Structures are given as C-alpha cells and as structure tokens.
Curated annotation (Swiss-Prot):
Name of the gene encoding the protein in the UniProt record: SAPP1
Catalysed conversion reaction: Preferential cleavage at the carboxyl of hydrophobic amino acids, but fails to cleave 15-Leu-|-Tyr-16, 16-Tyr-|-Leu-17 and 24-Phe-|-Phe-25 of insulin B chain. Activates trypsinogen, and degrades keratin
GO terms assigned for molecular function: aspartic-type endopeptidase activity
Cleaved signal peptide residues: 1-25
Origin organism lineage: Eukaryota, Fungi, Dikarya, Ascomycota, Saccharomycotina
Pfam families: Asp
Keywords recorded for this protein, A-Z: Aspartyl protease, Cleavage on pair of basic residues, Disulfide bond, Glycoprotein, Hydrolase, Protease, Secreted, Signal, Zymogen
Source organism, top-level taxon: Eukaryota
GO cellular component: extracellular region
This protein's name: Candidapepsin-1
Organism per entry: Candida parapsilosis
Disulfide bond residue pairs: 109-115, 320-354
Positions of the catalytic residues: 94, 282
Cell location: Secreted
Amino acid sequence: MVAIVTLTRQVLLTIALALFAQGAAIPEEAAKRDDNPGFVALDFDVLRKPLNLTEALLREKRDSISLSLINEGPSYASKVSVGSNKQQQTVIIDTGSSDFWVVDSNAQCGKGVDCKSSGTFTPSSSSSYKNLGAAFTIRYGDGSTSQGTWGKDTVTINGVSITGQQIADVTQTSVDQGILGIGYTSNEAVYDTSGRQTTPNYDNVPVTLKKQGKIRTNAYSLYLNSPSAETGTIIFGGVDNAKYSGKLVAEQVTSSQPLTISLASVNLKGSSFSFGDGALLDSGTTLTYFPSDFAAQLADKAGARLVQVARDQYLYFIDCNTDTSGTTVFNFGNGAKITVPNTEYVYQNGDGTCLWGIQPSDDTILGDNFLRHAYYLLYNLDANTISIAQVKYTTDSSISAV
C-alpha cells in the first residue's frame, strides 16, 4: 500500500506493507541466550476479500501511478498497543507507506466504513500521550483519506515497547482501520492540504526500534505464507532462515520512494522477455503490474485479452479454464530469481469471468501474487537493499538478527 504524499498530502496498494495479528513468540532458546535478541517478531492475520469489479472496479494507492490498481485481495493485519494503558489496535502493515496512524475513539467514519471495529485510541486515557498540535492528512489513490493530529506515545509490538513514538491520532477517515507504514522516512505524510509542511520528517517505527536498541538494523523481513494460509510473519531486525530455500540475494534499492529494485527479465511459457527497469515490491498491492507495452507482450504469450471496463480503463481477462501448469520466472539485476506458479495469474471475478494476474499500469509493481513466493523479502533500509529468495512454506523457524 503506498501512501500518496502530495504537497497537499497517503497509501492501499498498498500495503497498503500496514501490522499483523497475534504476536509471534520469540523462540524460547533465543530468549535464554539473550533478553534482547536484536529482533522483534510479529504474526499477522491474512484478511481476504474476493476480487469483484462490480463492487470496486479499481483501487490504487500511490501518487505516481496514473492507472488505477485492483486491491480486493489479501491485506495483513496485526495487533499492536498504543499508550501507557496499552490500548489495542489491529492495524494493516504496509511496506509502501511510512506513517503509523490509529483511529480515535471519537472519529467520524466515512459513509459505509466501520473504521472503529478494529480498535480505537483515546489520547486522554494515556498518561504518556503528547499532542504535537500539528495537522495530519494522508490521501489514498482510491480516494480514501484520513485526517487527524500528530502526537507521540508509547507503542508496544509483541511485548516490546518504544517510547515517544510519533503517531497520528485520526479523527476522520474513510479507511477501514489504522495503518502501520514501515517504509522510508522520506515518504512520510508531513504536509497539509495546502502544501505546507506541518511537521518535520521524523523517526518512524522501524527507525525508533533501532534507536531505542530493540533491533540492531533498520530492516524487516516479510513472510506472507502460502496462498491459502491465514497467518504470516513480519520480523523487525531479523530474518527467519527456515522460510526460504537457497540463499538470500541482496538487490540494490534504485528508488527509496517507493522501494524499487531492478528487474532484468521475465520468463513465461518458454519465452524470455527483457525488461531492465525498476520494480516496486508492495505488500499492499494484490496483483502484478507492468507498463502497457510490456504487459501486452506477456498477455499475448499467456492468451489474456484486453477489455475496456470503464472510460479510459482497460483490464486483462483470461479464460477461467486456461492451462495453469508451469511457472513464470522473474530474474533480477543482481542474480536473484523467483519462480511463481501460473495458478497465481487466474483470479475469479464476481461475475464468473477471470482476471489475469498481470495488469497494465504506468509503473511496475510486484504485488502479493509475486511476494507470496519471494520469501524472503528482507528490506534493509540502512543498507538500501532488498534481499530476496524463493519461499519455503514451513512451520519451522530459525530466526536470527541482521
């Protein structure tokens, strides 16, 4: 989910990476070795909505994308606590945005939005809350917005607390629940609707975790688990070495806003298609997106057809009975290679048709249908690298700090 940070000033296809459910326990043996192992592990729940163009034709979450993106698939929600009295919030973890905001207990929810069902925050009941008196505004590309006030308070993630964390207390929103953005600080929503900077860029949650000694490196790894799984894990400052095969290959980030690495080529149905440009890895985006010309090459090979679904809006559809055997291979600039089963590219729509899992856009985005197979995603914001390896779906765990 990527926040739109206009000079007015937010993010869903994103992340919308926003945090995930039931905190994952640190392995007992690690706890015995060191009370502070240098990482914080957190489980999350996978929240799924079916793709349905009749209800939500197009959704997108970033200002740099002119063609709307579909985000009716999974999102990733986790429980965190805010305040001296640990007020519990279930928030979406989002790698594409950078701000942590919660829903105020007196917030006004947009029409048809139940924004308070995942937990609310009452600043006056937290003795550690400090109102910064600056306006917070963030806008998503799908038109949803959140407004409120910047403040600081204690944030607790799976029993690990950081103090004085800058957060936004949202009093008006058309978003379903709060979002924990964990991207670069350069992508923070620090401008109001007139383009005036209301607060300086600040230490967001990953940065604060490092500065307060909870993790050793401003990095996090993401395990989205299998397509049918109900839970996954994010580890701040660590990596689970049991969750991938082969070795992690570090790819240099080519753009910090958003997190982009170089994609060299794509192999599909026996043909190799050279690409040679940047690709954004975004946990808040459901499908995979390529510029129109490149998407057309892949579509021709896959047998997908372009259909006009709205004014100036085209999507690829594919026969629901198409042969989904085989794989699509993504080759990255520094040698990383990720194999994705072709079952990830046929999506049942609500009307009996099937969407193709690759769609046209002005920008290249590798969404959840790619990321589920690319564990490990180790985002190292200190080294400006994203390390990836082929996923290994397993309940085994072997976490180490990075």
